[in-house]
Amino acid sequence: MAKKSMIARDVKRKKMAERYAAKRAALMAAFNAADDPMDRLEIHRKIQALPRNSAPSRIRNRCWATGKPRGYYRDFGLCRNQLRERAHKGELPGVVKSSW
């Protein structure tokens, strides 16, 4: 189980990224469309002025059952340990143990 403070920090980052997503996307579109280097520099400064935690790259994928950040499977939203446990119990429809 991950520390509750780390899980809370990640939730805070998700909310902040959602809040600033439109503004960040507009600035990035303007940055990519700008031809003048001075305009690009000004827009870049505005992007840098946004809160650091509003960047989507700072959000960490976490297991919804345990909060673990490592060994995360996107298809299920679970870490590898929980995926194995729940697959053995039959709680994941369509997941079967492979044999050949």
Swiss-Prot record:
Domain of life: Bacteria
InterPro entries: Ribosomal_uS14, Ribosomal_uS14_bac/plastid, Ribosomal_uS14_CS
GO process terms (BP): translation
Pfam annotation, one family: Ribosomal_S14
SUPFAM superfamilies per record: Glucocorticoid receptor-like (DNA-binding domain)
Assigned keywords, A-Z: Ribonucleoprotein, Ribosomal protein, RNA-binding, rRNA-binding
Annotated GO CC locations: cytoplasm; small ribosomal subunit
GO molecular function, one term: rRNA binding
HAMAP family: Ribosomal_uS14_1
NCBIfam families with a match to the protein in the record: PRK08881.1
Biological role stated in the UniProt entry: Binds 16S rRNA, required for the assembly of 30S particles and may also be responsible for determining the conformation of the 16S rRNA at the A site.
Quaternary structure and partners: Part of the 30S ribosomal subunit. Contacts proteins S3 and S10.
Protein name according to UniProt: Small ribosomal subunit protein uS14
Source organism per UniProt: Parasynechococcus marenigrum (strain WH8102)
Lineage per the UniProt record: Bacteria, Bacillati, Cyanobacteriota, Cyanophyceae, Synechococcales
Chain's gene name: rpsN
